[in-house]
């Protein structure tokens, strides 16, 4: 879990991990030099639960660096992702890991609901396909980072590309290029929080960052990039209906 000035929401995010029906977890939080009470809040949880560990980037470096610090210190075979303002449903880990074991798969994700900044439901649920591969994902970035679990004993070790935005998209594509598809559970296992920064300008920036992933990370030619981007834009609109 990366954190930066997350004092308003991080307690709820941490509590959603503590409340999991699956108990064999470790929560690795890397703080990116927060200026609020984020660290103090995390430290209070650590006193009560030694499965929670806190690291620091040392200097403000962005979410990719924070996530990678946690990845470097993770000891488990399953890697799950959660941002400091989002929430897991209590049976998320148990349900998803059992699904992965039964299907013998390396990369899974799930449907998730969207909540308002105050935690109340918006009524919007993002429903996911049962399976998606590299070319499908280029056109439909449907995978919510907060829902992903990866078996790194199957995929091999990985880090998030150190880019300013869309690091998760770039990582999923990297893993897919290793020959793995992502398998979706229709169960709604997480809640994505819409915060005040989730505005039109941020969405426009996210769209530009997706284009950068096509051209600068994946090195896709302009024509195919345009085709993929049209698919991305259409699916982004559908996702918000």
Predicted segments, located by residue:
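Short, well-formed alpha-helical segments that are part of the catalytic scaffolds
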Residues: 6-19
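Acidic helix N-cap motif at the loop->helix transition within catalytic regions
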Residues: 9-11, 33-44, 87, 91
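A conserved acidic beta->alpha catalytic loop
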Residues: 16, 23, 31-40, 59, ...
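Conserved nucleotide-sugar donor-binding catalytic segment
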Residues: 72, 124-205, 209, 213
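Short aromatic/hydrophobic "clamp" motif used to bind/position activated sugar donors
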Residues: 79
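The conserved acidic donor/metal-binding loop of glycosyltransferases
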Residues: 83-87, 111
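Conserved donor NDP-sugar-binding/catalytic core segment of glycosyltransferases
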Residues: 91-122
């Amino acid at each position: 879990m990366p954190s930066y000035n997350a004092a308003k929401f991080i307690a709820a995010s941490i509590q959603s991990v503590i409340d999991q029906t699956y108990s064999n977890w470790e929560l690795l939080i890397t703080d990116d030099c927060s200026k609020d009470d984020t660290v103090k809040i995390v430290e209070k949880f650590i006193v009560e639960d030694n499965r929670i560990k806190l690291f620091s980037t040392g200097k403000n470096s962005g979410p990719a660096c924070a996530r990678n610090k946690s990845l470097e210190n993770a000891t488990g075979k399953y890697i799950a992702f959660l941002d400091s303002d989002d929430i897991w449903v209590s049976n998320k880990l148990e349900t998803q890991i059992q699904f992965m074991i039964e299907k013998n798969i390396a990369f899974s994700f799930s449907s998730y609901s969207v909540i308002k900044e105050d935690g109340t439901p918006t009524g919007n649920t993002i429903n996911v396909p049962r399976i998606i591969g590299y070319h499908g994902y280029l056109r439909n970035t449907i995978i919510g980072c907060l829902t992903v679990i990866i078996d790194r004993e199957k995929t091999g070790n990985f880090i998030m590309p150190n880019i300013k935005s869309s690091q998760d998209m770039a990582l999923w594509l990297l893993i897919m290029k290793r020959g793995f598809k992502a398998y979706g559970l229709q169960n709604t296992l997480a809640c994505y929080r819409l915060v005040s920064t989730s505005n039109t300008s941020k969405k426009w920036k996210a769209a530009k960052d997706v284009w950068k992933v096509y051209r600068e990370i994946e090195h896709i030619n302009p024509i195919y990039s345009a085709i993929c981007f049209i698919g991305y834009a259409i699916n982004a609109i559908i996702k918000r209906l």
